[in-house]
């Protein structure tokens, strides 16, 4: 497969990044600079496949139904969560994206449906039966129902590894649109960004705990995200309630995609820790 990629693209060097349902290849020129991204579905290949170039333009953001997709690389590097200027650029990109794609209200009916569907799915996971996920989701529903939201387009996986920053012109490019929704919950992308800031490290539970206590590496980024969300949504948001919701959604995703037991149980423990915070 490596020879096939080299022959089809003309690039001899690349970096692989594994995702749930695909493998991404970042193609490098002779100087080692990224030039293109290939998204290759996890499937059988007979090496007659064509590489389909794509240019994303709203609302057609999702991946086309082809095995191999090619996009130009529009960044210097992935977002650095410890660089507050990078975080601000990502937040500016997200608020502009939501302002430009907002539509009708994300009302109490939408929130009720979202929460009840999540409860029903989580009921299948034995490892959390003794944890108060129903109670935490009811708290989430009560909390966000009091806030006026508009539906917006949702990237669906707006986290550090999918955000590229161009240092030359201080612009942002976002990759991996496989979970894109044209209309959805505007909180999802903010919480994905926050989670990817504070759940990192060899011990994600302790990393999260230290960031929430105000002693972790990502505290400046977390403060900026909180401030931006409160101003953008014109509300006093309870971040613990929102993070519980985020962790439960990741836990369900990992359960469905049969992720490694280490990754899976990390989120069980993250939710356990968050559920114990008053």
Each model region followed by its residue ranges:
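Conserved kinase catalytic-core helix
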Residues: 46-63, 77-118, 133-153, 161
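Juxta-kinase regulatory segment immediately upstream of eukaryotic protein kinase catalytic domains
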Residues: 1-16
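Helix-rich C-terminal or lid/interface subdomains of diverse kinases
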Residues: 192-195, 209-278
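Active-site Asp-x-Gly
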Residues: 168-215
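Active-site acidic catalytic loop and adjacent metal/ATP-binding pocket
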Residues: 24-27, 142-188
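ATP-binding glycine-rich loop module of kinase domains
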Residues: 20-49, 72
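Hydrophobic residues embedded in beta-strands of well-ordered beta-sheets
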Residues: 34, 69, 170-172
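Conserved short submotifs of the Hanks-type protein kinase catalytic core
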Residues: 68-76
């Amino acid at each position: 497969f490596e020879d096939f990629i080299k022959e089809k693209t003309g690039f001899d060097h690349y970096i692989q990044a594994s995702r749930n349902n695909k493998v991404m290849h970042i193609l490098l020129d002779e100087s080692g600079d990224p030039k293109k991204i290939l998204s290759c579905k996890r499937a059988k290949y007979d090496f007659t496949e064509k590489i389909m170039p794509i240019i994303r333009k709203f609302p057609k953001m999702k991946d086309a139904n082809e095995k191999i997709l090619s996009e130009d690389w529009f960044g210097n590097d992935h977002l650095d969560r410890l660089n507050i200027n990078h975080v601000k650029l990502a937040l500016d990109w997200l608020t502009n994206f939501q302002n430009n794609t907002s539509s009708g209200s994300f009302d109490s009916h939408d929130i009720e449906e979202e929460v009840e569907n999540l409860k029903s799915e989580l009921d299948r996971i034995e490892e959390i039966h003794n944890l108060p996920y129903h109670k935490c989701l009811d708290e989430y529903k009560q909390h966000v129902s009091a806030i006026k939201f508009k539906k917006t387009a949702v990237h669906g996986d707006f986290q550090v590894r999918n955000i590229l920053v161009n240092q030359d012109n201080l612009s942002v490019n976002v990759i991996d649109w496989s979970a894109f929704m044209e209309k959805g919950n505007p909180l999802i992308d903010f919480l994905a960004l926050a989670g990817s800031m504070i759940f990192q490290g060899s011990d994600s539970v302790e990393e999260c705990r230290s960031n929430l206590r105000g002693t972790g590496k990502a505290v400046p980024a977390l403060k900026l995200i909180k401030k931006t969300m409160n101003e953008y949504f014109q509300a006093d948001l309870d971040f613990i309630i929102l993070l519980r919701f985020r962790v439960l959604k990741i836990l369900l995703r990992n359960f469905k995609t049969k992720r490694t037991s280490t990754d899976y149980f990390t989120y069980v423990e993250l939710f356990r820790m968050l559920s114990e915070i008053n």
